[in-house]
Amino acid sequence: KKAADTLLDMLRENGASLFIFPQHKDEIIDILRNFRDRDAYDAKPSQPLERLEAEQFTTIEIDQEIQSLTSSLKSLGIAEAPRESYLDEIGSLKKNPAAYINYSGLSDHVLKNIPRYSRSNQMLQNDIDAISYIILQRDGMRYETIESCQSIFLTTNYSLVREANQFLRYSAYKMQISPIISDIDLTSILWIKYAMQNNNIPRLWLISAANAAVSPTA
């Protein structure tokens, strides 16, 4: 949590606008509901939520979390992302071919290489929609600096970052800001650029990375 708070603080301090995709907000609500309705004796428990487990949240308290999600996000300065149009300012279809990704190709690639997406077609569609939105908002342009980049899809899904950027031909060895980026990579960029005086950041991310290694995702 401290690492995430640090990242959000750096983004705000450097003028970033923070948004959540509506479909991902719905996913959060579904996760909370599944956790609320979980069967304690089920051999296959629902997705664990550390804070709720540790604090032993009741059903009523989880319902309150769901009801207050919008205001909680707002308190963090996170708004719901507006819909991106395929039309330009004068009502014409955006002409840059690079603004349109191979949607089915990317979906197939991600599904093939990240097994857990086979369990939820909706989750796959949500993430591919988000990537498509970002590239469309960028009008297919590639950026070399974080300041010039119009939008980024920030996620802790490191497998998705790897596979999507591989399919979209964003090499880790090129100085380009990819449309989808991990929280660790973005924090590293911001720390190097703006916050090297905060020597606590690397330690926070080492802790975060260690926690992720204990429970890796496919």
Q: Which sequence ranges carry the predicted segments?
A:
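Active-site-proximal, substrate-binding regions of enzyme catalytic domains
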Residues: 2-151, 159-218
